[in-house]
């Protein structure tokens, strides 16, 4: 049985809501908004008369209460516990019998019977295993927060991601206001679905039309700017690709790529030199996917190539044009999946021409 959270962007990522007895792992950089998201989930579930136990190993009950007041969390179905000893947490769960338990975070939990320090591989593995069996046995949905390493992977043993039912990554540029929730594993739904949120003073606000949000403030009639359409899961999203091609006096030109695969950009520059006869060897090339979002889809190829050519020729691309398609080594543009859905998304926002 599924329970919709009431947050449509989160339900989209989960595949329709939380499954009873499931174990969900949420990872993300410090300060990205994981705890804020979880408290807002508590409010929505509380409105559906669900009992929630929020266990924090990093903050006191008073500190959680301060944040909950700021986020206007008013549900009386939420109970707070500041504890790191899993044996005590299990006894509280047995006494309260909640529908949902949130553990923030799994790296702070410890078990008396395991001799190593909290956060160690054995402690994290054993704590997750105990919680998994507890949730399945009592049909309690568990949500655990996991710290991430400096390269973005969830800290702890890789088996942690194998043990849980769903792995969600909460990501985004801290300098930007938006956040992206991405499912990288989901036993009860599709993967690579994304939900888009905006961080405001009162918490996270859902972005129901991310294309319009991502293109806000886009300059028109400027060379090097091209709109493309990427597909994240089943959701088409319009994004702006910017390129700057600048003459250099150095022997080796600079190449940079932000938000996309650097090697792919270098390959496209080589294709433009060989097939389109653009003399880019004496020019620095800087390519950026605006908004700080990261996309690994090959459908960006055509937009990147057009943006580079536009900047090199100093000719602006028409503001009502969308470009997407994969480029091969011989210079051909290959078809990409769900082209009709991408075109429909572009038409919805008033674009009149698609180059595919």
Would you name each region that the model predicts?
Residues 1-15, 19-25, 32-39, 43, ...:
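Peripheral, non-AAA+ core regions of ATP-driven protein-machinery
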Residues 29, 57:
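P-loop (Walker A) phosphate-binding loop of NTP-binding proteins
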């Amino acid at each position: 049985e599924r329970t919709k959270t009431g947050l449509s962007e989160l339900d989209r990522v989960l595949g329709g809501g939380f499954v009873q007895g499931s174990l969900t792992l949420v990872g993300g950089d410090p300060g990205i908004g994981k705890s804020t998201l979880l408290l807002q989930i508590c409010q929505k579930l509380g409105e559906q008369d669900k009992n929630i136990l929020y266990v924090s190993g990093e903050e006191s009950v008073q500190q959680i209460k301060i944040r909950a007041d700021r986020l206007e969390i008013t549900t009386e179905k939420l109970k707070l516990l500041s504890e790191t000893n899993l044996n005590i947490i299990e006894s509280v769960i047995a006494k309260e019998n909640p529908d949902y338990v949130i553990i923030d975070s799994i790296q702070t939990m410890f078990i008396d019977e395991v001799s190593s320090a909290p956060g160690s591989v054995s402690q994290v593995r054993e704590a997750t295993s105990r919680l998994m069996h507890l949730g399945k046995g009592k049909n309690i949905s568990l949500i655990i927060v996991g710290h991430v390493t400096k390269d973005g992977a969830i800290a702890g043993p890789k088996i942690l991601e194998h043990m849980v039912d769903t792995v969600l990554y909460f990501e985004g540029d801290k300098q930007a206001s938006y956040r992206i929730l991405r499912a990288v594993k989901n036993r009860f739904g599709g993967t690579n679905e994304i939900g888009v949120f905006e961080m405001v003073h009162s918490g996270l606000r859902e972005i129901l039309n991310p294309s319009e949000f991502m293109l806000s403030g886009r300059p028109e009639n400027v060379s090097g700017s091209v709109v493309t359409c990427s597909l994240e899961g089943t959701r088409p999203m319009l994004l702006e690709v910017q390129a700057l091609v600048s003459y250099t006096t150095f022997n080796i030109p600079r190449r940079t790529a932000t938000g996309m695969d650097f090697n792919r950009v270098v390959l496209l520059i080589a294709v433009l030199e060989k097939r389109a006869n653009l003399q880019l060897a004496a020019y620095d090339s800087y390519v950026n996917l605006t908004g700080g979002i990261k996309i690994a889809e090959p459908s960006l190829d055509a937009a990147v190539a057009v943006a580079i050519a536009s900047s090199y020729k100093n000719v602006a691309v028409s503001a009502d044009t969308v470009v997407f398609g994969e480029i091969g080594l011989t210079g051909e543009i290959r078809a990409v999946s769900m082209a009709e859905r991408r075109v429909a998304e572009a038409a919805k926002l008033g674009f009149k021409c698609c180059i595919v």
